[in-house]
A protein has these predicted regions:
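Short acidic, glycine/serine/threonine-rich loops at helix termini
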Residues: 61-66, 91-95, 113-119, 148, ...
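Gly/Ser/Thr-enriched, mixed-charge loops and adjacent short helices
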Residues: 2, 6, 115-240, 245-246
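N-terminal small/polar loop signature for handling phosphorylated ligands or for N-terminal nucleophile
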Residues: 51-114, 210-265
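Phosphate-binding and adjacent anionic-ligand microenvironments
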Residues: 247, 251-253, 274, 294, ...
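Conserved phosphate/anionic-ligand binding catalytic regions in large, soluble enzymes, centered on
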Residues: 2-22, 107-108, 191-203, 259, ...
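An N-terminal, well-structured beta->alpha segment
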Residues: 1-67, 74, 157-184, 195
């Protein structure tokens, strides 16, 4: 663990807990905190405050206290949550308490031996340019001997239930938009040993959903995540205990949140009386359609946000409601940033394919709590009309076009793996792809060089995005293939998207098979 240092990147820091500069410990987190303290003290003339939250991971509480030691030692006022809290609540507290910076200690859905350090700025969103690079420079200039751990207790304020109460109130007021009989809707919920174990039931109950069944074995916070292989609600295995309970109680919906409760997974009862897992794109389609359908007097002063690798169907939904649609790079921080970048417009909602969704701007990051409430709102309204969420999704396909996506991740471990990922990206960058499953290529976007090349007339346009290692191929029929290396794991990710018209519910199975075959053909073209 001494051969290289654990580095602080644009998304913060994530690594294995242990001794040494290549591990998560009080010194590596202390170095981050000293650098951020230096930046705050240099760039602000008034006394600033920070807020610190942490999830259920092993050693999170001790590490959070050590982070508080360093901030307070540097004369910065600290608000520290007294126990584990969801990441969206940290974003909320940052805005509410008018802090300059927020820190959450979490490693999302990584294995139990990991922990991480995520940084939020005064708007409530994750750090973005130019602040991210400035913080990295400050942190890199800190030596371990520069870190001051001398806690100033008079500057450390523990936060107990007040922020919870306000967050619950605001989540309900923003998410409770349906008109159904909520007490008839049967919900199974698992926090997968994470931070939503108390707050999500309180939000659902407060909104009127009283028929709630919690997976008891997974309702206790546990940094070892003993009942699952991975605490990731994208993985069917993580929801298997919840689905078993759903079968036993005949539930309408299954909700699972990841350890820091920013991402949510859903399984819903279909027409065969089985539970279907929704992917992140499908969830985003359902929530966006429902939220927009409940709003009156929409126009282009309102906008919704998404990312370059998420379903293009969202754009069709936005256009049909006459609201503006904005797209950012992969990562939810770019959706949060839109709210700052377009102050004259009103943000309604936004989402990405990786199971993250945000409703309103009262938080500035993905929020599993409010998203789960809206999912129950649309689900219970469907139930009162005698349909289920799969029917609702198919209705969306009929209205806006049937879009189907598939993500394939290829793992390449170690130093050799990094080289291989780089080589795959370069091959794709220089490839002379002419078509996608027989449909003529019309556009190639390279976000690393910020260029889009029109494949019909050879025209080159500049892309108005920060540079990022993402490639997107698009053909005449709207088929797209995107490729990018993962920011947090040794993987390269391929996103396939195909679409066609769906005329009726009866046609769904047949057309679904056509799109599945199309995806199989594409994966073969890209050597899978």
């Amino acid at each position: 663990s001494f051969y290289k240092n654990l580095s602080f990147g644009t998304g913060g820091m994530r690594g294995i807990v242990g001794i040494g500069p290549n591990r998560v410990n009080r010194y590596t987190f202390g170095k981050n905190t000293q650098g951020i303290s230096n930046f705050i003290n240099k760039s602000s003339s008034k006394k600033e405050s920070v807020v610190i939250a942490y999830d259920c991971r092993n050693q999170s509480k001790e590490l959070a206290n050590q982070v508080a030691d360093v901030f307070s030692s540097n004369g910065i006022n600290v608000y520290l949550f007294s126990s584990i809290r969801p990441t969206p609540e940290l974003s909320y507290a940052l805005i509410k308490l008018k802090c300059i910076c927020g820190i959450v200690l979490t490693a999302s859905h990584n294995p139990p031996e990991y922990n991480g350090y995520k940084v939020y700025w005064k708007d409530g969103g994750q750090i973005v340019p130019p602040v991210d690079k400035k913080l990295i420079d400050e942190i890199n200039s800190v030596k371990f001997t520069d870190i001051s751990f001398k806690r100033n207790n008079s500057l450390v304020n523990l936060i107990d239930t007040q922020i919870d109460t306000d967050f619950i109130h605001d989540s309900i007021s923003i998410g409770k938009i349906g008109v159904s009989k909520r007490e008839d809707y049967r919900i199974v919920f698992t926090p997968i040993h994470g931070t939503s174990y108390k707050i999500l039931p309180e939000v659902l109950n407060g909104a009127g959903f009283k028929n709630l069944h919690i997976v008891k074995e997974q309702a206790v916070p546990d940094g070892n995540f003993n009942t699952v292989k991975s605490p990731n609600p994208e993985e069917p295995e993580a929801l298997s205990m919840a689905i078993d309970l759903a079968k036993a109680v005949n539930a309408d919906i299954v909700i699972g949140t990841d350890p820091d409760a920013d991402r949510v997974g859903l399984a819903v009862k279909n027409n065969k009386n089985e539970y279907s897992l929704l992917n992140g794109n499908q969830m985003m389609i359902i929530l966006t359609e429902f939220i927009l359908s409940k709003r009156k007097n929409l126009n282009k002063s309102f906008f919704i946000g998404s990312t370059v690798v998420s379903t293009a169907m969202i754009k069709n939904i936005a256009e049909s409601y006459n609201v503006d649609f904005k797209v950012g790079l992969t990562g939810f921080k770019w959706i949060g940033k839109m709210i700052n970048d377009f102050p004259s417009q009103n943000f309604i909602c936004g989402g990405e394919e990786s199971y993250g969704y945000m409703v309103g701007d009262f938080v500035r990051d993905k929020d599993a709590i409010t998203s789960a409430l809206v999912a129950c709102e649309v689900g219970s309204e469907c139930k009162s009309m005698g349909i289920n969420l799969i029917d609702y999704l198919i209705d969306c396909y009929i209205k806006y076009g049937f879009f189907k996506e598939k993500l394939i991740s290829v793992e390449k471990k170690g130093a050799e793996g990094l080289k291989e990922i780089s080589s795959i990206m370069n091959k794709l960058r220089n490839s002379k792809i002419k078509s996608l499953d027989g449909s003529k290529l019309i556009s190639f976007k390279d976000f690393q060089s910020s260029l889009e090349i029109n494949q019909i007339n050879g025209k080159i346009n500049n892309l108005d995005f920060p540079k990022s290692n993402v490639l997107i191929f698009e053909s005449e029929d709207g088929t797209t293939v995107a490729a990018r290396p993962s920011g947090t794991e040794p993987k390269i990710k391929f996103y396939f998207s195909v679409n066609t018209i769906l005329k009726s519910k009866e046609d769904y199975e047949r057309v679904n098979q056509i799109l599945n075959n199309k995806i199989v053909n594409l994966t073969k073209e890209f050597n899978f």
